[in-house]
């Protein structure tokens, strides 16, 4: 998973510098808020909302030009509002997920690693990540 900036296709944003002069909605105190605060230019108008629903509603209703949120929240918003023509702009922070197995379960651990490696090599992980998260899986550990 990752936290990123999302916005309309017709708004050119490739990185933090492009946030200048734009209004970005973010959930107060969330990871996205902390990461956005580190990189947003002084001229960016960061509007903080109390929860994800309020943040997304502000973007959908046009109160903000851009949305800083997690991939799953943005994916849901884009699926429910295709008329917005929203898209992924750039990553604020990667938040990888991990699979844990009980200590000493080497057979299981090796099998899980084998399945992941096969999915990575075949491109299946990238295909699923693009479908569900809007971008490739990225550089996964071996």
Residue ranges of predicted features:
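Beta->alpha turn/N-cap motifs
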Residues: 1, 8-9, 29-30, 51-52, ...
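Flexible hinge/capping segments at coil-to-helix
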Residues: 7-24
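Short amphipathic alpha-helical coupling segments at ligand-binding clamshell hinges
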Residues: 18, 70, 104-118, 124-128
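Ligand-binding clefts/hinges and TM-proximal coupling segments of bilobed small-molecule sensing domains
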Residues: 31-48, 86-88, 117-142
